Every structure is written in structure tokens, then in C-alpha cells.
């Protein structure tokens, strides 16, 4: 990928994909995009002055590198191998960077299927949310052959910092396990705020203390005041996506004969919130369920 910048075909300009694709356009990469939501695709194309691809096959034919960032592995399979998929039109020697939070075993299968066509696929899911997607400061967990990752590094570096995780599928495994840790930290942190509030400590004070103490985590730093205590619940990451990632993490445990009772409990709590609050509720709204169970509300909307 040395010399002229490779042409990129970007599949999925949703909450995460749109700012990531925008970063690549700003960096000077020739980029075409496809999204199955025509209105969303048209809005992105108009904002960034690009022509949307009419079909996945059209996108594949004119791209050196394909980036997919989609809701789940089933949709990735449809994009690649479905009746309207792009696999048959991918150029030999092209690369697919699979940035969905996907199922590792399916990612391995996708890679093997495309290898027979002379196409490389490796997984590179991201962490950091929409704010860091906008600034190109995501954490990228890359699983695959190191030579393939190295060749794509100029593209990946536009989007964030890359940590190679090992063989194909390990990036997706690491993403799911990261969200397992993150989701557990969120739940226990909210319970601590509820307990402390009932005792008489101001929630904002508790967050301040946690952030300079050993209880600090991503949720105490970037979620509790911003989305829960403010009552905004609009981080941009939906409840069903969290449940999906936790299901993947638990599946990895089961496939590897690991007894993981806390992971199982964590996943069940989030699945319960998903059932009660709805799959499109923001994941930070899980705090509402904890509040309902305790009979107390923490935080309040800012005064207008």
C-alpha cells in the first residue's frame, strides 16, 4: 500500500462508521461508501462530497481496501457472501478490514473463504466510542497476519492506535472481553453510587473520589456524570450492541471450557435491561433498572 493512497470502499456509515470514514476522507484517501439505509448514505455523501456506491459489487470493483463496520457478523456474512454480496467482485490482492464487533469463529471462516479468492481479511474492531471515532483516537485491536496488518497500518493509524492481538479472530475476541470488563465496571459503579446516595453522599462527590482512587474506570471517568447523573443517556452505543458483545464473550468462554459465573451474571443483567428498556435504549440507561430495583434516583437534569 505504498505510494499512492489505496482506494477505500467503506461499508456502514452509522454512528461509528460515519466519523471513521470522515477521518479517512480528511486524510486524503479516495473513498466510496455503501450503506443499506439510503437516507443515511445520501446524507453522508452530501456532507463529504462523495458518490455513494449503488451496490456492494460496484464498491468492491473499484476498491483496493474494503472496511466493514456493521451491527453483527450475520450482516457481515450477507455483505460478503449474500445474494447481493461483494465477494465475487473483490479484486484478487485486495484487503478486507473487518471492524465490526464480530464473532471470532465466524471471522475465521470469512477469512478462509476469501483466501480462496486471493483476498485477505483480518479483524480490527475498535473501542473508544463516537467521540474518539470523530477525532481518530480509537483503540484498534487487530487480529491476523502481522504482514497484512503492517501493510494496512497507514489507514489504521488515521483511525486510532493499533494493538496487534495475534491470529485472525483474536481482535474480535479481545473486543468482546474488553466490553465484558467495561460493562461489569459500569454495573458495579452504579450500584456503588446508589448505595452511597442512600447513605447520604452526593453522587457527584462519589464520582470525583472514585476518579482519584483505585475505583476509577472508564465509566467513572467518561459515563457517570456525562450520561447518567445528567440524565441524558445518549452515549451513542445501544443496549442491544452491549448484549451482543457480552454474548460473544460468554460464547468464547463456553467454547474454551471456561466456567465464568460472573460473566454469565453480567450478561444476564444487561439482557434483562435490554428486555425492559428496549434494544435501542442507550446502554447507559441500564442505570435506570438499577435505580428501579433500589427505589432511588441518582442525578437530575441540569437546570435550563
Residue ranges and their predicted role:
Residues 39, 56-61, 65-66, 70-138:
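Rossmann-like NAD(P)(H) cofactor-binding subdomain of soluble oxidoreductases
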Residues 8, 101-180:
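Rossmann-fold dinucleotide-binding core
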Residues 1-69, 94, 163:
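NAD(P)+-binding Rossmann beta1-loop-alpha1 motif at the extreme N-terminus of oxidoreductases
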Residues 31, 52, 120-122, 163, ...:
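Hydrophobic beta-strand scaffold residues
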Residues 135, 140-143, 163, 168-199, ...:
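Active-site-proximal catalytic alpha-helix in oxidoreductases
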Residues 168, 172, 222-284, 290, ...:
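Interdomain hinge/lid region at the active-site interface
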